[in-house]
């Protein structure tokens, strides 16, 4: 399970009902929060066989109103920054820390909805055992 998938589950547990790891059709959700994994970089291999590294996740919030997009994006950033990450290892990956960037306006999408987003860097331990 990727950090984006884990973060989506954590956000869903906090009550966000419109979280996706791939952009949905507007027919499915007209105001989605999309978390996309950008890449994994291994920092070290541990003595116990696990790997420690960083996974960058792009978070994009899409809303009909500019103020709604900004407020939702700032709330998502705050909630990810303060989240309690599951202690168990889902699918071999465990999030141990997250650093979030500043939410910024990202313009509008093709249908005129407002976009706000930020990048988050997850420190992840991968267990292959």
Q: How does the language model describe each region?
A:
Residues 10-13, 59, 103, 127:
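Acidic/proline-rich low-complexity IDRs
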Residues 1-49, 83-94:
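Small/polar-rich, solvent-exposed N-terminal microdomains that initiate assembly or binding
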Residues 51-69, 74-76, 114-126:
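Oligomerization/assembly interface segments of phage tail-like spikes and tubes
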Residues 81-129:
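Acidic-leaning, charged glycine-interspersed low-complexity segments
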Residues 7-10, 72-79:
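Short amphipathic alpha-helices in soluble, non-transmembrane regions
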